[in-house]
């Protein structure tokens, strides 16, 4: 075979990645060898979380931009311009469902409900609000909703375990309600003292509900092992991943130029048979959004040897 400049560069890049980067994706039956470059024919699926990028888009713009950039899923954040809220009428909900279905675009919803308050009236308000939001999700064809834990006292505080148990019990009630509607409840790795995998694991244990899932949010502690609870200190990415791998239903992505070990995470997800979406959740709205989405997708695929 004649060696072209492209083949040479591809082969060199893959060889270097295999040596230097942990979690390098090795050849499989789904991968096709092309001139020494192993092409991943089954990459993970990319989506958009309308945190800042997309916050000012209406539904038509979301569909147009996601189709143009080949994103397969959108997580619609509450209060943003697309207006997918519990105030929608039955006819409006049916219209939202039809528009996304016709576009071939999967959707989830992102709420801000949380379950740590010691005020029982406030806690019940959040639980009931979650159930109302789950009904909205079912009506518009969403596959799941995002919720928060959203805070626990520091270790050593005698109320810590009580709050963790309260969060777990509340989430369990919501998860059962959601399952009856065909909608997943996904608690995000987020909040004060709850933005790490071991604490999310503890919450899942307290919930003891097979219908409760989680969102992997890419906290630095995932790979540094810093700031984790007693008994988990220094735990690495793979060990933390294994704690929750059967409960991950969504992943939030940050900028790919960060220090987070993306290639290793993508490899772990692939090996675990992850079928969900990875949604970009970037903090800069000032960029040229469509161009950024296209470039992000290139980096996302390149880190999986999928282009």
Regions found by a protein language model. Name each.
Residues 85-89, 119-124, 157-162, 226-229, ...:
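Short, solvent-exposed loop/turn segments at secondary-structure boundaries
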Residues 10-24, 38-40, 60-67, 97-109, ...:
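Active-site acidic/histidine proton-transfer and metal-coordination neighborhood
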Residues 72-73, 106, 143, 184, ...:
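Residue-level detector of anion-binding/catalytic polar loops
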Residues 50, 78, 114, 149, ...:
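Residues that line or immediately flank small-molecule/substrate-binding pockets and catalytic motifs
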Residues 77-95, 150-155:
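Glycine-rich, proline-tolerant flexible connector loops at the mouths of alpha/beta enzymes
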């Amino acid at each position: 075979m004649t060696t072209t400049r492209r083949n040479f560069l591809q082969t060199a890049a893959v060889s270097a990645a295999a040596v230097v980067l942990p979690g390098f994706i090795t050849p499989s039956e789904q991968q096709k060898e092309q001139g020494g470059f192993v092409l991943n024919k089954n990459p993970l699926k990319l989506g958009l979380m309308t945190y800042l990028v997309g916050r000012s888009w209406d539904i038509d713009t979301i569909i147009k931009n996601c189709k143009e950039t080949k994103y397969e899923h959108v997580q619609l954040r509450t209060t943003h311009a697309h207006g997918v809220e519990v105030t929608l009428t039955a006819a409006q909900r049916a219209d939202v469902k039809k528009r996304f279905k016709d576009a071939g675009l999967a959707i989830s919803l992102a709420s801000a409900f949380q379950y740590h308050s010691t005020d029982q009236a406030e806690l019940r308000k959040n639980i009931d609000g979650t159930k109302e939001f789950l009904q909205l999700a079912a009506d518009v064809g969403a596959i799941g909703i995002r919720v928060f834990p959203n805070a626990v006292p520091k270790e050593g505080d005698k109320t810590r375990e009580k709050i963790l148990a309260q969060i777990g019990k509340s989430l369990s009630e919501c998860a059962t309600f959601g399952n009856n509607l065909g909608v997943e409840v996904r608690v995000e790795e987020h909040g004060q003292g709850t933005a790490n995998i071991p604490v999310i694991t503890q919450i899942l244990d307290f919930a003891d509900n097979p219908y409760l899932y989680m969102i992997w949010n890419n906290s630095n502690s995932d790979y540094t092992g810093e700031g984790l609870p007693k008994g988990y200190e220094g735990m690495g990415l793979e060990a933390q991943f294994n704690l929750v791998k059967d409960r991950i239903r969504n992943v939030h992505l940050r900028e790919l130029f960060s220090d987070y070990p993306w290639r290793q995470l993508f490899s772990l997800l692939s090996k675990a048979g992850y079928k969900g979406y990875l949604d970009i959740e970037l903090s800069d709205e000032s960029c040229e959004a469509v161009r950024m989405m296209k470039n992000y997708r290139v980096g996302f695929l390149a880190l999986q040897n999928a282009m």
